[in-house]
């Protein structure tokens, strides 16, 4: 058993305090520190470097591969590919990942008699993907729909954003929030959710020891990338994002090299790529899937046979949650995408308006049951 620090707020005062709880399957392991610190896993620098998506070994070849991946993930590239994709191939993908709207009746039949628990990514799921990440606003109609959803089912936002940033967009106190790819988890404000009436609001931060390092790398990345027009470094508290959506494609290789040159000096951080964004995160066994598992346990559904989790997301980082649900054999994932992608999700939706439509239909169905 490993002890973990979990922060809870006092039911009467609302003051945040720290307590220690025993480790369970969802808590393994905590943030990895240098081997001199007791209670942490010792991993050699050489082995850790292998976990980076790009590193010093064979730099030129890996960098070219990285830039190719950057191009492949761009919506423009996907659109050009779609024009050449055969209709048969697209239809085959749709058969494997049918529209959640078209399959709504089947979904409801599977969920009947079970407790639906909803998990939602933010960017590209509740809000459109935009050039400026600070302007990724959700519509008022989407906010009203999510608010109604939270009245019917326990609802969580699971995002790469920091909690403060995503809360400034969503503005709903009755939700659970898992920011920084699940490394910063906070329950609803007490009194706002009927699902946590008798429980303190839980705040779990498995990568807390990495905060000084993340801040240090953030400052270096800001300095390193300031000469690249359009590049934007975002501090998501427990992880960092380097957005290149507004960077000229001719500068992508240069930007990738700059980012790599910083991250390579921190072997306990890993570098990966999302939708026109580099992600820098601590190398710990924690992701959106682990966050989903932790939230289910916090809600009392850890060993429950009649729970039905639904996770909706559009990014590579959401795949960990999709895979977890497949492994549990409970609920399913829904990928938000207009184009065929390799995914562990069971169903698909094309864009945020379709997500809102699906959520609205779930709310209507629940209200009819009551």
Curated annotation (Swiss-Prot):
A single GO cellular-component term on record: nucleus
Cofactor(s) this protein requires: a divalent metal cation
SUPFAM superfamilies in the record: HAD-like
EC number(s) on file: 3.1.3.12
GO terms of molecular function: trehalose-phosphatase activity
Gene induction: By cadmium in roots (at protein level).
InterPro entries in UniProt: HAD-like_sf, HAD-SF_hydro_IIB, HAD_sf, OTSB-like, Trehalose_PPase
Pfam families: Trehalose_PPase (PF02358)
Keyword line: Hydrolase, Stress response
Catalyzed reactions per annotation: alpha,alpha-trehalose 6-phosphate + H2O = alpha,alpha-trehalose + phosphate
Tagged with keyword Membrane: no
GO biological process: response to cadmium ion; trehalose biosynthetic process
Pathway: Glycan biosynthesis; trehalose biosynthesis
Function: Removes the phosphate from trehalose 6-phosphate to produce free trehalose. Trehalose accumulation in plant may improve abiotic stress tolerance.
UniProt similarity note: Belongs to the trehalose phosphatase family.
PANTHER family registered for this protein in UniProt: TREHALOSE 6-PHOSPHATE PHOSPHATASE (PTHR43768), TREHALOSE-PHOSPHATE PHOSPHATASE J-RELATED (PTHR43768:SF44)
Protein name: Probable trehalose-phosphate phosphatase J
Source organism: Arabidopsis thaliana (Mouse-ear cress)
Taxon lineage: Eukaryota, Viridiplantae, Streptophyta, Embryophyta, Tracheophyta
């Amino acid at each position: 058993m490993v002890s973990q620090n979990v922060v809870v707020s006092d039911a009467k005062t609302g003051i945040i305090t720290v307590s220690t709880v025993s480790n369970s399957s969802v808590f393994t392991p905590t943030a990895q520190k240098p081997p001199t610190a007791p209670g942490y896993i010792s991993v050699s620098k050489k082995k850790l470097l292998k976990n980076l998506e790009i590193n010093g070994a064979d730099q030129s070849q890996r960098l070219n591969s990285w830039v190719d991946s950057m191009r492949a993930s761009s919506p423009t590239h996907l659109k050009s590919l779609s024009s050449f994709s055969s209709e048969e191939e697209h239809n085959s993908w749709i058969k494997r990942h049918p529209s959640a709207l078209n399959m709504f009746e089947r979904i409801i039949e599977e969920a009947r008699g079970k407790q639906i628990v909803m998990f939602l990514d933010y960017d590209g799921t509740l809000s459109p993907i935009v050039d400026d990440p600070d302007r990724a606003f959700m519509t008022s109609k989407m906010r009203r729909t999510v608010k109604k959803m939270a009245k019917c089912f326990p609802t969580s936002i699971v995002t790469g954003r920091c909690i403060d940033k995503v809360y400034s967009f969503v503005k709903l106190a009755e939700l659970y929030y898992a920011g920084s790819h699940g490394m910063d988890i906070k329950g609803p404000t007490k009194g706002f959710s009927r699902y946590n009436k008798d429980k303190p609001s839980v705040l779990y931060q498995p990568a807390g020891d990495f905060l000084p390092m993340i801040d240090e790398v953030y400052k270096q990345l800001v300095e390193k990338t300031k000469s690249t027009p359009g590049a934007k470094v975002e501090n998501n508290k427990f992880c960092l994002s380097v957005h290149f959506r507004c960077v000229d494609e001719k500068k992508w290789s240069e930007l990738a090299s700059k980012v790599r040159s910083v991250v390579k000096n921190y072997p306990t951080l890993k570098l990966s790529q999302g939708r026109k964004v580099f992600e820098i995160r601590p190398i710990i066994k924690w992701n959106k899937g682990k966050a989903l598992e932790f939230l289910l346990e916090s809600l009392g559904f850890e060993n429950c046979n009649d729970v039905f989790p639904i996770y909706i997301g559009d990014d590579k980082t959401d795949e960990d949650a999709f895979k977890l649900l497949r492994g549990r054999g409970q609920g399913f994932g829904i990928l938000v995408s207009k184009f065929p992608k390799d995914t562990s999700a069971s169903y698909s939706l094309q864009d945020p308006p379709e997500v809102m439509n699906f959520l609205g239909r779930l709310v209507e169905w629940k209200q009819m049951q009551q």
